Amino acid sequence: MDVRRLYDPAAFLEAASPLLLEDEARHNLMLGIAATLRDEPSHYPAHRLWLVDDGLEVAGAALQTPPHNLVVARPCKDGAIEALATEIEDDLPGVNGAVPEAVRFAEAWAAKTGKKPRTTFAQGLFQLDRVESVSGVSGTLREAGVEDRELLIEWWQAFVEEALHESAVEPADHAVDHRLSAREAGVVIWDDETPVSFAAFGGPTPNGIRIGPVYTPPEHRRRGYASALTARLSSRLLETRRLCFLYTDLANPTSNKIYEQIGYRRVCDAAAIVFD
């Protein structure tokens, strides 16, 4: 198999789309990052793109926006993941992707480099195409603005520390600023006399968009705010798209149940793996 390094995100998307759109939900992260690289190149200071070609079709794909982890697609031919691990010469901090392809790449990379893979986050990937409405929750949804920036940065960092159990590669202020200014991203807040919860969205795919993070401070929990916020935001996004995606922490069964009640269904598991 031939592993090719590409430099043009538009060319990468055009070539990889037949593979990626076979399972749009599974590949929403790669599709969203590649679209951002194409449409808003200033958001990422650097990028690396790879395709695996078996002579007949694109059999595998991967991308990285340093210093973030590599993202891998599910291959359509045996050996594509291993070919990527063999041919990529750049140093990698880790790999993100659906299971089992992320695990397979981590194993191949460990065999090549001697580094030890360690799973830092086990996730469930969920998809929604119709919302089950939530009632009986006080408050209203509104779009966040620059006047909410400091609060959103505080909440974003709190989410990272609580849910991811480690510092994020992307600083909270950078993440918030991007979503407040990007064309196909945004942040919404649930107000109940005061701001009580927030959700962000972005990473557009041809037919969908990803929601996350969703965060409610501890003092405002167990009142249904996150459920109402996610349901209302999902409904709004489905006015212009067919699908919504989100990732959940598999160690938090409460949040998984909340999303299922709204109408999200689990597509697959995903993992973030670092190389020690």
What do these predicted regions represent?
Residues 1-30, 131-167:
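Short amphipathic alpha-helix that is part of the acyltransferase structural core
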Residues 3-9, 18-24, 31-94, 196-209:
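Conserved donor-binding loop and adjoining core beta-sheet/short helix segment
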Residues 26-46, 164-191, 195, 200:
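Active-site rim helix/loop that mediates acceptor-substrate recognition in acyltransferases
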Residues 54-138, 273:
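Acyl-donor-binding surface of acyltransferase catalytic domains
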Residues 77-87, 212, 216-218, 222-238, ...:
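Conserved acetyl-CoA-binding loop-helix of GNAT-fold acetyltransferases
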Residues 96-102, 246-256, 273-276:
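Conserved beta-strand-loop-alpha-helix junction that forms the acyl-donor binding cleft
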Residues 111-117, 260-269:
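Conserved acetyl-CoA-binding loop of GNAT-fold acetyltransferases
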Residues 189-191, 202-204, 223-236, 247-249, ...:
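Recognition helices and adjacent regulatory flanks at domain boundaries
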